[in-house]
Amino acid sequence: MKIVIAGAGEVGTHLAKLLSKEGLDIILIDNDENKLHAIDANYNLMTMTGSPTAFKVLKNAKVDKCDLFIAVTPFETRNIVSCSFAKKLGARKTVARIDNYEFLKPEYQQYFAEMGVDDLIYPENFASLEIRTALQHSWARNFTMAS
């Protein structure tokens, strides 16, 4: 499976590390060459310096052949636009990190689908799910009650 990840921040780097350990074909795109060099030296993945909203960068990353394009830069609009471009170039599935919870409303899903964004990630949802799951375990309840 070929996966292209746009954004070498905490989320993108974590995803790239995890997925590369699974033996998947990973390309990580970011503007910061120093970040990419540090990651490239330690993990089995390919890195590419550039903007995920530049057609040249997306074409060089061969998004037309990727099974999954994940945009997790710190900028919501960049994530949406890069997913839209990747989808138009042939990416099979696209996922964009967002900061606006309103975008998750069912009535807006069609808009994103029409733009080429298949799924949205709202990081705060993951945090709340993890907290809820932790509180269901006795060790977490005991820890929070003791504090």
Where do the protein language model's features map onto the residues?
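Cytosolic regulatory regions of ion transport systems
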Residues: 1-147
